Amino acid sequence: MLRFLKRWFRRLFAKQDVKLGLYGPPNSGKTTLANRICKDWLGEELGKVSKVAHETREVQMKESVTIKSKDGRELQFNLVDTPGIATKVDYEEFLKAGMPEKKAKKRAKEATKGVIDSIKWLDDMDAVVVVLDATTDPYSQVNITIIGNLQAREIPVTIAANKVDLRKANMKKIQAAFPQYNIVGISAKYGKNINNFYEEVFDLIGA
């Protein structure tokens, strides 16, 4: 309750300081979505995207992002793109991606620190968009861990089911896994359904 009141007062008296976090497992499309938001409203990207897991290993923040709703409302927030959360980071997965052993071990160490930092940053979040890959099993241990941490902190959540442009995408499975949350299917890469996503952000933050 104390965390909830802290976030409520911060939104009430300092709306420009509202923090919207993008959380999710590695390679779910968090940075792709962050780049889509920043390009749509600021004309520039936020971070680098890669097919190799844990490309984002440090928290990245873009301040003063202002979006507009269909009915003309404006919402300003600080967008926080976090490293992918994993229950285990093994340097061997980077070896399989073709990295030299020394670089793979360094990447694994950085990725582990990134996971810890992501969890720490949760206490500063006013709202969170959990970005899930709609082509993968939503009942994974890491997804349950992320949702559990958010529930424990009473942080408002919307789920973005990403990659719905792919044939294997299964929105119904995600909806069945997390019926307590609003879920919007998007393709961050191609911008599919992105306007509906922005409307969800307005509802999430309560603007």
Regions found by a protein language model. Name each.
Residues K106-Y181:
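Conserved C-terminal guanine-recognition region of P-loop GTPase G domains, centered on the G4
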Residues S28, R57, Q141, A169, ...:
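Charged, alpha-helix-enriched surfaces in structured cytosolic catalytic cores
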Residues M1-G98:
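Conserved G1/Walker A P-loop phosphate-binding module
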Residues R36-I37, E92-L95, N143-I147, K172-A176, ...:
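Short, glycine/charged-enriched secondary-structure capping and boundary segments
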Residues K19, K163-A207:
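Canonical P-loop GTPase G-domain recognition
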Residues E55, G84-A86, T135-D137, K163-R167, ...:
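Conserved nucleotide-binding/hydrolysis micro-motifs of P-loop NTPases
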Residues K88-V115:
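Charged, glycine/proline-rich intrinsically disordered loops and linkers
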